[in-house]
């Protein structure tokens, strides 16, 4: 069991059970484009827990993308190679899902690893080992980048130095990813978006995936209802949208750094409440990037402290009620399938 301190809400299954919903549009295929798995002192979320969430939700989740979270790092060996353990772990989970015994979904069909880009050009041998260990499922890397000068703004067990994405070693590592046709998943706050835009301009062959709506901060010096914060975030996202090698995950609404307070209520939020609260962010992102560059993702179990899996997907489906069938397909599975080169789409019938 891993000892990891993270500023995430505790998952209270008894509280979540106080509100359940039947799935909306249960036939609509879904690729969960961002989730984690771990076994920590604060809780376990592994194959059975993820599979149970999928099955009890009633939604048609056909595939998922595993994203690094420092799970099962190798105990021994060079520090730079310890993240290979997480890739092995996720690949093993993927093999379990591929057996057909779990939720009829291809869980962890794509893997985003955590090799440090600070190794620069020296990443190449490690990347080749990672691809082999993943069983061909490796699609990219993610490094801790979210930094804010105010200590009240925190979202990760690892706080990186300021400006890491601007450093020369990191950018050489990013270029190495591009040479291997691997993407870079990025979790930063809205105050850092210009750094990522600069990186995207410098390496136009690198596919960059912006996690969690571009990290609009709603705590500490910022307020979720602050119009200045919203405009600053929108300006940063607009500059990113101008770059064709950038796409966005619509996710992370249950992170404490976002500033929503649904977890403080006596009962969990319903999907209508969530959709209403999220709509300004959703509409802005889709208007800037287009549905073909946006994908929904659960960010479970991080976001499970604020709402259940089924309610989350119902909220997403409420967000797209005015969207065309093609736009809905883009948001729920096609963008993720294209971005991460997922073969499960061959079996999807979204008609």
Feature annotation, model-predicted:
Residues 32, 212, 299:
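Acidic active-site catalytic centers that drive phospho-/nucleotidyl reactions
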Residues 97-104, 134-135, 202-207, 243, ...:
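Short helix-capping segments at alpha-helix termini
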Residues 70-71, 117, 145-147, 188-192, ...:
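Active-site-proximal loop/turn and secondary-structure-junction residues that shape catalytic pockets
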Residues 2-180, 200, 220-224:
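Mid-domain alpha/beta scaffold segments of enzyme catalytic cores
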Residues 80-95, 125-133, 195-209, 263-281, ...:
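Short, electropositive alpha-helical surface patch
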Residues 1-29, 45-53, 62-63, 283-284, ...:
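Mid-to-C-terminal alpha-helical segments outside catalytic/metal-binding sites
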Residues 38, 66, 89, 114, ...:
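Tryptophan-centric aromatic hotspots in well-structured domains and transmembrane helices
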Residues 6-8, 161-295:
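Catalytic pocket-lining loop regions of alpha/beta-barrel enzymes
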